[in-house]
Structure formats: structure tokens, C-alpha cells
Curated annotation (Swiss-Prot):
<keyword id="KW-0066">ATP synthesis</keyword>
<dbReference type="InterPro" id="IPR023366">
    <property type="entry name" value="ATP_synth_asu-like_sf"/>
</dbReference>
<keyword id="KW-0375">Hydrogen ion transport</keyword>
<dbReference type="GO" id="GO:0005524">
    <property type="term" value="F:ATP binding"/>
</dbReference>
<keyword id="KW-0406">Ion transport</keyword>
<dbReference type="Pfam" id="PF16886">
    <property type="entry name" value="ATP-synt_ab_Xtn"/>
</dbReference>
<dbReference type="GO" id="GO:0046961">
    <property type="term" value="F:proton-transporting ATPase activity, rotational mechanism"/>
</dbReference>
<dbReference type="GO" id="GO:0045259">
    <property type="term" value="C:proton-transporting ATP synthase complex"/>
</dbReference>
<dbReference type="Pfam" id="PF02874">
    <property type="entry name" value="ATP-synt_ab_N"/>
</dbReference>
<feature type="binding site">
    <location>
        <begin position="228"/>
        <end position="235"/>
    </location>
    <ligand>
        <name>ATP</name>
    </ligand>
</feature>
<dbReference type="InterPro" id="IPR020003">
    <property type="entry name" value="ATPase_a/bsu_AS"/>
</dbReference>
<dbReference type="InterPro" id="IPR031686">
    <property type="entry name" value="ATP-synth_a_Xtn"/>
</dbReference>
<dbReference type="Pfam" id="PF00006">
    <property type="entry name" value="ATP-synt_ab"/>
</dbReference>
<dbReference type="GO" id="GO:0042777">
    <property type="term" value="P:proton motive force-driven plasma membrane ATP synthesis"/>
</dbReference>
<protein>
    <recommendedName>
        <fullName>V-type ATP synthase alpha chain</fullName>
        <ecNumber>7.1.2.2</ecNumber>
    </recommendedName>
</protein>
<dbReference type="InterPro" id="IPR024034">
    <property type="entry name" value="ATPase_F1/V1_b/a_C"/>
</dbReference>
<dbReference type="GO" id="GO:0046933">
    <property type="term" value="F:proton-transporting ATP synthase activity, rotational mechanism"/>
</dbReference>
Length: 578
């Protein structure tokens, strides 16, 4: 055991001397209270430690003890429906132990050591096992939780516990070399869990939000960023994704954001039902709360803890969504620690390795064949909070170069009460062409063409709006006025969505396709009518315009009949005009 003494304290950074033999990223117990810290730089026998708890009251000369182990998480049954702090300490158990405030130096296990789980073995004595293989299963809510061999373990099974109820601490499998395998194992958070190989992302991560699913889709196993200024709806968008996306498990990391936002999740999610299982939505969610009033250093750890938990569920063959809200606060934590270590700053005071750290985090997403031979995926959606909505700042620019989908939130849209306030002219997705075959097969053959037509109309409308602002709408011909009106219909009746409406909060691909088809059928017929000499005002008086506007509030069950009637009405209305 390596023990040194505190030489200097600078905010969350502690400099200790006499630490010869300690290693990078080892966990240390700092001071008399044993605060948790991590070595982030070594220089001779001097160690630079970032402390994950409040350092006020520490004194020079107090001991610093290296445990010789890296920051690791416990992975096993009991994580779902849990809420942890940034270094995987369960808040519920801390409250039982110390009350409503987190006492410094408190030690609690991440997984419940008392609870018994119904173990069903899947291996027998004599079997050869290796990392990632399934040893047995445990039911957890509506999931079958697979107990995995840790990735770096292999050997022959000597004995297996029979089916029954055991705690996570009891060995359930013993190998011939004496290795005892329990229902849980630990894994260092800074090391990506190994996989057999990565796959091309070719299935969409469906969110239930029309603008994202249709115009800017992200693939299962892809990465997306949601940058936007304050009040533009980043958190509500991420909470909608956590509620309605087609992921099996959601890991929600509240990194340096307000505590109320985590409270919202804790209040709302248990009341909502998971459309797949019918159980509470909280049963598929792991929350990591590292709010703005918690120590800065733990923000950096919380992102890694979240992605490691996501990789563990991926290794069981689940598709996992990781919501990081917000990566800007994480970058600010890097900046804070970097300045305390007196490192050379780069742009806006951020450390020069900011882009490398962001890339290393986002690269842990992906659709993979796991070590156990199953298919799993981690999709990462990171919110970015640029100060004052300035998209040219380093975190946004570094993220922009890494992610596959960029959903830009716009304050001017939010002020106009257009939600989700995603700017369709400033966002993009690199997954569109890779996902087109899936859409052709599972939605409709002409789906990509309809989507492109909608995009083109929105771009034409944006160009015409500039002319309107200069010379007014009267200078436009009827055909151009039609483009502006259809653009308005697309914006208000297709792109807008009410996250708090019981029907409109979620929209299936079939329904989105139906609404697109109705809008484009209306545009085609109206364009032909204008060529025949019908005035634009007559066209806009048609009751079918209102019918298209009501489509988004029609339930999924009633929509097919509604769609058929609307299409007939569009045909009939324009015949009557002729």
C-alpha cells in the first residue's frame, strides 16, 4: 500500500508527495475522512489527484493512500430502476445511512448485498467458458438479466450452484483454477469493454419524434448531438427520447445540470408505462445524477460510469440508449481540473486534449457482435450547452466533427413556441443513405423520395421567406405562395410535436409516412389546380387543409381509416374546384 501526504490543495485537485510506485488512474483515499480521488498525473514521487468529493477542510500533511485499483463500477443485477451519483454510489442507500445530504467519505456498495436473486444456471461442470459467455440468468422486472463471464476470464467449470436464490456476493460458478465467479463483476470505467467486432449501423434508432425519425435519423449504435442555448428544449427532447425510443435500456446521465431536471425524471418515469413491456418506464432506466451543486471532478467520472453501464447491457444483447445531459458541463469540469494542474490552455481555456476526450467517449457507441456472440448496440445522444447559443465554441465544434447526427436547437424557434425547436436548415444526419434500405423494406418503397420532397419544399420555402421579408407576399406568384403555405403546413402540422400530449407525444413511422403522403398529395393537386387558373385563396379555403392539420392528433389505431378518407377528400375537393 502506497501512502503519501498532501502537499498542496487547489479546489478539487490535490497534490501529494511520497507516492512513488503509484499508477495513473489509481483510486486514492484522501485525508483523514478518506475522500475518493483519482490520480490523473504523476511526476516523480508527486501525484496529482482529482477528488470526487468536496475538498473544503482538507489540510496539508494529511495522508493520501493509493488503493492500487482504478475507478471501477460494479456490474450485475440490481442496477435497473436505480439512481446513482457520479461514481456509482446509490443515492437511496446513502440517504438511509446519512440522511438527505451526502456526507463526505461515505462508503456504500453500488449493488445491494442483501437482496436474493432467482439464479438459473446455463453451464455445467466440465464446460469451457471464456469472457462474455452467459453463465446463467436472473429475472429482473420484465428483463432476463444474463450473468456474464468477465471479459478477461477464461477456464473450465468445476462446480455450479443449483437453481435457487442467492445474493450477488455468493459465488455461483467455480472454475478449475479456483476462480470464483459471482453474479456481479467490476470493470474499470476508462476502458471500453471488448467486443468481437463492430457492425455497420443499418437499423434506425426510432425516437417517436417526426422531425428526427424522418429528416435527421440516427442509426441504432450511432451518435447524435443536441446543441442549443438555454430554454431551447434540450432536456425535454432527451427525456422524450428516454421515454419513447425503441431502446431496451436507457442510461440517463445528468451531468452538471440542475437537480430539478433529475427530479422531473424521477417523478414522471415511474408513472409512465413502457410501450414494449407494459411495466413502469423506470424499470428499464438507470439514472446517474451528478447535478450542478455536486463536486466538479465527479462530472468527468459520471460520463464514463454511464457509458460503462451501457456497454454492460449491450454485452447481454440489448440495445441501449445513453443520454448525456450535458457534455458541455463535462468539458467545463475538464477545463477546471486542467487549470488547477496549471496545464497550457487552448481555445477558450479548454485543455488541448478536449477533442480527443470527446472522441474517445463517443467512439464507445456502436452496433456490435459481443464476446458472447449476441448482437447489441449503444446509441449515444449528447446534449451540448454552448454559452449564449454560440455554435462556434470549442465543445460544439469538436462534437460536430465526431457525431453522425446533429440536431441543432434554435432559440428563435423556441421563442415562437415551435417545439421540438430543431432547426431543419441547420441540422443534418450522415445515416440517411445507410438507413434507406430499411425504410424501403419496413415502411414504404417510396419513403426516401417523399422525405426528400419534404426537405426540398422546406428549403424552397426558406429561400422565398427572405424575398417576402424584403418585398412582402404580394410580389409572389400563386405557385410561389403555394410553396410558402405548404411549408407552413409542414412546419406546423408535421414538424411541430407536443411532448406533453397523450397522442402527439409519440408518432410511429407509419403515421409519419401517412401525414407526409397527405401533405405531398395536397401540394401536387394544388400545383396542378394553379396551372389550370384556380387562385391560391380558393385552395386555402378548402376544409381538407384543416383535416391535414388534425392528423397528428389522431390515435395510431384510428389513423389508417383517417388517412384513407383524407386522401379521397383531397382528390374530391380538387375535382370540385375544376
Amino acid at each position: 500500500m502506497i501512502q503519501g501526504v498532501i502537499q498542496k490543495i487547489a479546489g478539487p485537485a490535490v497534490i501529494a508527495k511520497g507516492m512513488l510506485g503509484a499508477r495513473m488512474y489509481d483510486i486514492c483515499k484522501v485525508g483523514e475522512e478518506g475522500l475518493v480521488g483519482e490520480i490523473i498525473r504523476l511526476d516523480g514521487d508527486t501525484a496529482f489527484v482529482q477528488v470526487y468529493e468536496d475538498t473544503s477542510g482538507l489540510k496539508v500533511g494529511e495522508p493520501v493512500v493509493s488503493t492500487g485499483l482504478p475507478l471501477a463500477v460494479e456490474l450485475g443485477p440490481g442496477m435497473l430502476n436505480g439512481i446513482y451519483d457520479g461514481i456509482q454510489r446509490p443515492l437511496e442507500r446513502i440517504r438511509e445511512k446519512t440522511g438527505i445530504y451526502i456526507t463526505r467519505g461515505v462508503v456504500v456498495h453500488a449493488l445491494d448485498r442483501e437482496k436474493k436473486w432467482a439464479w438459473t444456471p446455463m453451464v455445467k461442470p466440465g464446460d469451457e467458458v471464456r469472457g462474455g459467455m452467459v453463465l446463467g440468468t436472473v429475472p429482473e422486472f420484465s428483463f432476463t438479466h444474463k450473468i456474464l463471464v468477465p471479459p478477461d476470464v477464461r477456464g473450465r467449470v468445476k462446480e455450479v450452484k443449483p437453481a435457487g436464490e442467492y445474493t450477488v456476493e455468493e459465488p455461483v460458478v467455480v472454475l478449475e483454477d479456483g476462480t470464483e465467479l459471482k453474479m456481479y463483476h467490476t470493470w474499470p470505467v476508462r476502458r471500453a469493454r471488448p467486443v468481437q467486432r463492430k457492425l455497420d449501423p443499418n437499423t434506425p434508432f426510432l425516437t417517436g419524434m417526426r422531425i428526427l425519425d424522418v429528416l435527421f435519423p440516427v442509426a441504432m449504435g450511432g451518435t447524435a448531438a443536441i446543441p442549443g442555448p438555454f430554454g431551447s428544449g434540450k432536456t425535454v427532447t432527451q427525456q422524450s427520447l428516454a421515454k419513447w425510443s425503441n431502446a431496451d435500456v436507457v442510461v440517463y446521465v445528468g451531468c452538471g445540470e440542475r437537480g430539478n431536471e433529475m427530479t422531473d425524471v424521477l417523478v414522471e418515469f415511474p408513472e409512465l408505462t413502457d410501450p414494449k413491456t407494459g411495466g413502469p418506464l423506470m424499470h428499464r432506466t438507470v439514472l446517474i445524477a451528478n447535478t450542478s451543486n455536486m463536486p466538479v471532478a465527479a462530472r468527468e467520472a459520471s460520463i464514463y460510469v454511464g457509458v460503462t453501464i451501457a456497454e454492460y447491457f449491450r454485452d447481454q444483447g440489448f440495445s441501449v440508449a445513453l443520454m448525456a445531459d450535458s457534455t458541455s458541463r463535462w468539458a467545463e469540469a475538464l477545463r477546471e481540473i486542467s487549470s488547477r494542474l496549471e496545464e497550457m490552455p487552448a481555445e477558450e481555456g479548454y485543455p488541448p486534449y478536449l477533442a480527443a476526450r470527446l472522441a474517445a467517449f463517443y467512439e464507445r457507441a456502436g452496433k456490435v457482435i459481443t464476446l458472447g456472440g449476441e448482437e447489441g448496440a449503444v446509441t449515444i445522444v449528447g446534449a451540448v450547452s454552448p454559452p449564449g447559443g454560440d455554435m462556434s465554441e470549442p465543445v460544439t465544434q469538436s462534437t460536430l466533427r465526431i457525431v453522425g447526427a446533429f440536431w441543432r436547437l434554435d432559440a428563435s424557434l423556441a421563442f415562437r413556441r415551435h417545439f421540438p425547436a430543431i432547426n431543419w436548415n441547420g441540422s443534418y444526419s450522415l445515416f440517411t443513405s445507410a438507413l434507406d434500405p430499411w425504410y424501403r423494406e419496413n415502411v414504404a418503397e417510396d419513403y426516401p423520395e417523399l422525405r426528400d420532397a419534404i426537405s426540398e419544399l422546406l428549403q424552397r420555402e426558406a429561400g422565398l421567406q427572405e424575398i417576402v421579408q424584403l418585398v412582402g407576399p404580394d410580389a409572389l406568384q400563386d405557385a410561389e405562395r403555394l410553396v410558402i403555405e405548404v411549408g407552413r403546413i409542414i412546419r406546423e402540422d408535421f414538424l411541430q410535436q407536443n411532448a406533453f400530449h397523450e397522442v402527439d407525444a409519440y408518432c410511429s413511422m407509419r403515421k409519419a409516412y401517412g401525414i407526409m403522403k397527405m401533405i405531398l398529395a395536397f401540394y401536387k393537386e394544388a400545383e396542378a389546380a394553379i396551372k389550370r387558373g384556380v387562385s391560391i385563396d380558393e385552395i386555402l379555403q378548402l376544409p381538407v387543409v384543416e383535416r391535414i392539420g388534425r392528423a397528428r392528433y389522431v390515435s395510431e389505431e384510428e389513423f389508417p381509416a383517417y388517412f384513407e378518407e383524407a386522401m379521397k377528400e383531397i382528390q374530391g375537393a380538387f375535382k370540385a374546384l375544376a
